[in-house]
Design a protein with these regions (language model features):
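Short loop/turn motifs at secondary-structure junctions and domain boundaries
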Residues: 41-45
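Conserved beta-strand in the GNAT
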Residues: 52, 58-70, 81-86
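A conserved beta-turn-beta hairpin within the catalytic core of GNAT-like acetyltransferases
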Residues: 68-82, 92, 142-144
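Conserved acetyl-CoA-binding loop-helix of GNAT-fold acetyltransferases
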Residues: 87, 93-106
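Conserved catalytic-core motifs of GNAT/GCN5-like acyltransferases
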Residues: 117-119, 129, 134-151
């Protein structure tokens, strides 16, 4: 029996991959959470680095990294923003979110970024804290959902 994980993370390289990213985001953010969002324009943002998580060949999670034009207030250097982290309900709890975040963090380091920021839903704050992110804002609302800004330097 192989101990190799059936989970694979890789960049979204083509239109088919980007459509899988969009499908996962629609399920998680719109169907599950009831958000009304304009995902398509974001998915077509070619400046973003999108990743997909596959479990036994099926796309089950996604996230993206954007390089910010300026660092967050109070920070120095070049920073990135992690956004649209989503894992299908049937695949949660298997370490996929952590693997996605690690892949995005590694890409940020390759790009020479000094840190990452993100807007975490209040319900996911503890996940990001376990990954070294620190809350850097009061609670605010995006798409009707409470969020906090979080940051992690490298």
């Amino acid at each position: 029996m192989s101990s190799e994980s059936p989970i694979r993370i890789g960049p979204a390289k083509n239109e088919g991959d980007l459509m899988q990213v969009l499908a996962i985001q629609e399920v998680v953010f719109i169907e599950e959470q009831g958000m009304s969002m304009e995902l398509e324009s974001e998915i077509l943002d070619r400046e973003a680095f999108h990743v997909l998580a596959y479990n036994q060949g099926h796309a089950v999670g996604t996230g993206r990294l954007l390089v910010l034009s300026e660092p967050p207030p109070g920070e120095q250097g070049r920073w990135g923003q992690v956004a649209r982290m989503a894992v299908l309900r049937s695949s949660r709890g298997a370490g996929i979110g952590k693997a996605l975040l690690e892949t995005l963090s590694n890409e940020a380091r390759k790009l020479g970024l000094n840190g990452l920021s993100l807007h975490a839903q209040a319900s996911t704050q503890s996940f990001y804290e376990k990954e070294g992110f620190v809350v850097s804002s009061e609670v605010f609302y995006e798409a009707g959902v409470p969020h906090v800004e979080m940051r992690r330097g490298f």
